[in-house]
């Protein structure tokens, strides 16, 4: 198949003329075309010698239409009238005839001209009449100021924008004593506002509720599955050292006390370095901690980012690592029961029930003897009263059975069995008939209110079945 040749387009004549005029290598048709010396241009020049076209502008020049320009279709251009200076009218010169005198009178008769003020003519013989006064009192002018009255007026305008509103202070709830609470109704139309309380942590919760009303954002309670800690792209590295919980940065670099362990930690390593723990090699970032639950254990997790490779552009590439430390590795049992140690040894007396589990016996005896009220009376009274108060010492926390001001007899509950005591029954008869009902006060430090509520099914709203250290008034 023959090869098809394509002719390349030459540059324009103007571009060629700019480059080849100086060197003299222009083609034969470039210079006449640019300089206007073609055959057509020569014919127009020769024809213009014998034919006059006027100011029509016919030729090889720019098409401007001559001096008058092109006339638009549909009419002639509007004419412009030049307004020149206004000429003055000529002054008519009167010719002088032969009969006119050549002397012109310049001064007219002065008697005809009246100018200036008229002078009066005095014709009388008597002179002016002068009037005089015979009073010899000198003229005294009274220049004392007259009394002036000053009037000051004031006007009060009521502006609602600056009126202070009326403030009604309702009586607040006051505590009369340590056990009795009283409240009074509010004044006016104002009333107290009841705010529903929210239970943040309960036994029936799922574990995802916040443990306080304003939880700290540092450590999550239980991390959700959205973290992606156990994916195929994440390397799993267990950390057995418990220092990972409090000092995670000490595994990747040397100790630096100026950092917050609850936030993301960023490391700036030199080109060649050796970390304290080889598992933390090339770690540049340790993210915030998260508490997770895995197979019945509590686990502290931190996600780290390695920077093993570095490109020419400065980007660092590395794997994603999941560092975790098991805080409570409790093995699961088949029955799920955990054996508990008895709090009191066998053969303990009733006086041992008043002491703390972790109290030191030798130190407790020294504390009891230092209290004068306890050295002279037994620990347990004869009427089986229970009262306890905590006492803190420099060695340990000890619970010592001191008096709280009220000795309340212990009452039986649904799961408390006490020995029966023979208490004599005494009937009190009032000396006068009671016509007005009085309040009956039940004194108790710990008792159950409506024990039948215990066997009711649990609801979302928790019911308080008992009160402590209070009085109940019943009609």
Curated annotation (Swiss-Prot):
Highest rank taxon of the organism: Viruses
GO biological process: microtubule-dependent intracellular transport of viral material towards nucleus; symbiont entry into host cell; viral penetration into host nucleus
Processing after translation: Highly phosphorylated.
One GO CC term, this protein: host cell nucleus
Protein name: Minor capsid protein L2
Locations listed in the record: Virion; Host nucleus; Host early endosome; Host Golgi apparatus
Assembly, per entry: Interacts with major capsid protein L1. Interacts with E2; this interaction inhibits E2 transcriptional activity but not the DNA replication function E2. Interacts with host GADD45GIP1. Interacts with host HSPA8; this interaction is required for L2 nuclear translocation. Interacts with host importins KPNB2 and KPNB3. Forms a complex with importin alpha2-beta1 heterodimers via interaction with the importin alpha2 adapter. Interacts with host DYNLT1; this interaction is essential for virus intracellular transport during entry.
Main subcellular location: virion
């Amino acid at each position: 198949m023959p090869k098809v040749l394509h002719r390349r387009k030459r540059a324009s004549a103007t571009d060629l003329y700019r480059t080849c005029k100086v060197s003299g290598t222009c083609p034969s048709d470039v210079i006449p075309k640019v300089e206007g010396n073609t055959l057509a241009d020569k014919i127009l020049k020769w024809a213009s010698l014998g034919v006059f076209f006027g100011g029509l502008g016919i030729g090889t020049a720019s098409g401007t239409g001559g001096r008058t320009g092109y006339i638009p279709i549909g009419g002639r251009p509007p004419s412009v009238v030049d307004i020149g200076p206004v000429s003055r009218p000529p002054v008519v010169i009167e010719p002088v005839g032969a009969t006119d005198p050549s002397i012109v009178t310049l001064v007219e008769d002065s008697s005809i001209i009246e100018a200036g003020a008229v002078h009066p003519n005095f014709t009388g013989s008597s002179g002016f009449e002068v009037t005089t006064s015979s009073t010899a009192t000198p003229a005294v002018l009274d220049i004392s100021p007259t009394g002036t009255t000053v009037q000051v007026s004031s006007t009060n305008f009521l502006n609602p924008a600056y009126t202070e509103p009326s403030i009604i202070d309702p009586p607040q709830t006051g505590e009369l004593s340590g056990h009795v609470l009283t409240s009074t109704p509010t004044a006016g139309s104002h009333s107290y506002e009841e705010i529903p309380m929210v239970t943040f942590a309960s036994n029936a919760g799922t574990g995802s509720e916040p443990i306080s009303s304003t939880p700290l954002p540092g450590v999550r309670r239980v991390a959700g599955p959205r973290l992606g800690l156990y994916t195929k792209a994440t390397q799993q590295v267990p950390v057995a050292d418990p220092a990972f919980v409090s000092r995670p940065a000490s595994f990747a670099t040397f100790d630096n006390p100026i950092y917050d362990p609850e936030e993301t930690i960023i490391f700036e390593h030199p080109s060649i370095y050796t970390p304290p723990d080889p598992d933390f090699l090339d770690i540049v970032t340790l993210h915030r901690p998260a508490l997770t639950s895995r197979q019945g254990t509590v686990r502290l997790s931190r996600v780290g980012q390695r920077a093993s490779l570095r490109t020419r552009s400065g980007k660092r590439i590395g794997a994603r690592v999941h560092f975790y430390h098991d805080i409570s590795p409790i093995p699961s049992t088949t029955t799920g029961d955990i054996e508990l140690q008895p709090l009191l040894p066998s053969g303990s007396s009733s006086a041992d029930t008043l002491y703390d589990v972790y109290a030191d016996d030798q130190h407790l005896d020294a504390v009891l003897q230092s209290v004068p009220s306890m050295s002279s009376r037994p620990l347990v009274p004869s009427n089986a009263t229970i009262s306890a108060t905590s006492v803190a010492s420099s060695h340990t926390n000890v619970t010592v059975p001191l008096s709280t001001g009220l000795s309340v007899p212990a009452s039986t509950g649904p799961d408390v069995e006490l020995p029966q005591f023979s208490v004599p029954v005494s009937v009190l008869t009032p000396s006068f008939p009671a016509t007005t009902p009085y309040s009956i006060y039940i004194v108790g430090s710990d008792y159950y209110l409506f024990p039948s509520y215990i066997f009711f099914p649990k609801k979302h709203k928790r019911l308080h079945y008992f009160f402590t250290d209070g009085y109940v008034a019943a009609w």
